[in-house]
C-alpha cells in the first residue's frame, strides 16, 4: 500500500511530503515546530496528549518540563487552524477534535 502522505482531520489537511497545511482548503503557514506539533495531534485524533509527550516528541528531552513552551505553541496553532480544533483537557493536556 502507498504510504500515507496526507493526514486529514475535520477540515485540516497536513501534507507530510510538502510540509503544507490547509484549513478548509486554505493554505496556512506554520513554523517547523508548529507543523510537528500539529502532526503529532493529527496522528492521535481525539486522544489526549500530555505536555510531556508533546515536549519530548516536538522539542526533545532537553527542554524543561516546567516550561510553558507547549502552551505558547498551542496558542499559536489555535490562531492559525482554529481555536475550536484543539481542546484543552484540564490537568491532562490537549487533544485534536475531528
Report each predicted region and the residues it spans.
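Short, cationic-aromatic polyanion-contact patches
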Residues: 95-98
Amino acid at each position: 500500500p502507498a504510504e500515507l502522505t496526507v493526514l486529514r482531520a475535520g477540515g485540516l489537511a497536513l501534507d507530510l511530503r510538502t510540509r503544507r497545511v490547509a484549513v478548509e482548503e486554505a493554505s496556512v503557514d506554520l513554523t517547523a515546530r508548529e507543523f510537528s506539533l500539529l502532526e503529532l495531534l493529527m496522528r492521535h485524533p481525539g486522544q489526549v496528549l500530555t505536555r510531556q509527550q508533546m515536549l519530548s516528541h516536538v522539542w526533545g528531552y532537553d527542554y524543561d518540563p516546567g516550561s510553558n513552551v507547549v502552551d505558547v505553541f498551542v496558542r499559536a496553532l489555535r490562531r492559525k487552524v482554529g481555536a475550536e480544533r484543539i481542546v484543552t483537557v484540564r490537568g491532562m493536556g490537549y487533544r485534536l477534535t475531528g
